[in-house]
Amino acid sequence: MRLIAFLLTTVIASVVVADDHGSAPAPGDGAFVALMVQAKDPDAYIEVMKENTAPFEALGSSVAGVCVTKTGADYPGQMFVWNAFDSMEQAMAATDAYDPMKAPAELAALRDVKYNVMFKPLKAFELEPNSERLWRLKISPSNVAAFVGKMTELETALRAAGHDMNIGVFQPFGGGTHETIHLRAVSPTYAASGKVIDEALAGAEWMSIWGAAMGLVDEIISDNFEHCQVIYTAS
């Protein structure tokens, strides 16, 4: 079931620098706040949050969920809690509504907070969390718009080839020295993700689009697989 569709709307000046790549794609609606943590027991932490929705209600989130790092973790228990909002205004207002460093003792005992950050989707993105490959990418501002355009083209090609895949590109705000552009490739299962990789390695026609997009990337900072899920939806 489609939970949320972030459709094309306004333009963020910081990521739509005019250049030889032509018209810049418009970002998607909505915004996210992410709290990066180290959980002592991710499953236990997630269950407690499912049972205690007060923090999500205080934030005013439309939808909230978690992503647990499954491969390439920087530390044991690497995960983050995300909250979806209708706008950057609402996302940034959430920082006044809830301080994760003052969480109830039951929650605080289950995780160590690393940092928090806000993200804006730079293309339409359907929120259907499951098997997710996340790349953190360093991309020159002058190439971001073209990269987003290539990811939109790639998503269309993958779906035409029979893959149920959502691709997201996200601009961080307030991420300190930790964050860069996020690229997410979301499939309904890990097996489905693996099938895409098999076809890529076999020289699928759509790989030419991927190659052109990677030519716009200065550096791949990290590459992980995560398992993501929704744990709260506003009533």
How does the language model describe each region?
Residues M1-T9:
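Sec-dependent signal peptide recognition
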